[in-house]
Amino acid sequence: MRLFLTDNTFKVHGQVYTGVPFLVDDEMALVNAPNDYLFYVSVVRGRTASAKTWQTYGNHLYEFFGFLESNDLRWDNVNQTHFAAWRDSMLTRGCVRSTVNQRLSAVSNFYRWALRDGLTHNLPFQTQEVWIAKPAGFLAHVDAKGNRFQANELTLRTAKGLPRFLLTEQAKQFVATLSPWRNRLMAYLMWLCGLRREEVTALNMRVLPNPSGHAPGKGLRMMLDAKITPTKGSKTRWVLVPYDLVVQLWDYMVFERPRLTKLYQNKHGKDETDLLFLTEYGNPISLEGMNNTFRKASEKSGVKCTPHMLRHTFGTYEFLRMSEHKSSDGALHWVRDRMGHSSSSITEVYIHAADLVSHDEIDGYQAEICELLKGDVNGYSS
């Protein structure tokens, strides 16, 4: 079994698609079923736009179909025992559990596609319902009623006490119900930058980067200088803030904050405060107030969320996103430094949480959230 990628001569109705993976067997014959699925993932399905994500799917299917070929098995004539043997063979070769689970996820998605398209009549594995907060394996299906998932029974347990986080659609649904605009901005800082609730409520306006002169689409560094703005353990670090969020924060600071600052001065008889966020009455935002806001939004949206869950959401998605550009250790260190963890061992929990998210969930997720931000452009009037 061999894996190849298309070059710039591969066209579909005149459109060039470079980097589409495809498999050939030892006799250099195309392997139709997985290639049809890889074509679907790369060309047809709109959510998977990254060539790196296509190749990840190709690598996972290459591993599985190589196992089938070496054992003289047909893909449409395997059962759960064959799946278990493949899983255990990867462990024997030293593959880490998170990698094994990601491969199980990709191949299970292939079989679901084949079942849907009538290429097979049953799934060669059993599923069980799990909750996102429990240690389970890859994410296969999201139940519309809540955080319930249909997970492959073959998936390996990775770690106890996985962090509770939201999927992108859940987070979007939750954040959209937050009001006023200020609360949505604070939520975005936790969701997109991994700030703690204590860091958001006490954020000093002086650390906010100026988007003027910067190219749209590129993130800006925000230095959380512990001498200026409170951080856990008084540790200085920087976070990368998406350009669209920086613009929104500046709009808030220019259009909404001056009115709140006057209320603050009238109420407290003090000079102007450097706090970026103030309540509608001009008071500093309390942690209890933020918790109450999230509790009400959870009831309204039907998505249970706490401030720390948004931070966990950042950690989980950011680890997977950076894993496409860095080694696993490099991605881990990046997330550790952005989140301000004192040790990589604390950050490692996101490696295991990432098993719950399939790769196409990651593809372009930041751009998707930034589009939501752009739609909130007149937020300061709400």
Task: List the model feature ranges, each with a label.
Residues 2, 365-382:
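C-terminal secondary-structure termini that scaffold catalytic or DNA-interacting sites
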Residues 36-55, 59-141, 173:
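N-terminal core-binding DNA-recognition domain of tyrosine recombinases/integrases
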Residues 122-168:
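Flexible interdomain linker/hinge and immediately adjacent N-terminus
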Residues 202-248, 262:
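Conserved tyrosine-mediated DNA breakage-rejoining catalytic core shared by Y-recombinases
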Residues 339-367:
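Catalytic-site neighborhood detector that most strongly recognizes the C-terminal catalytic loop/helix
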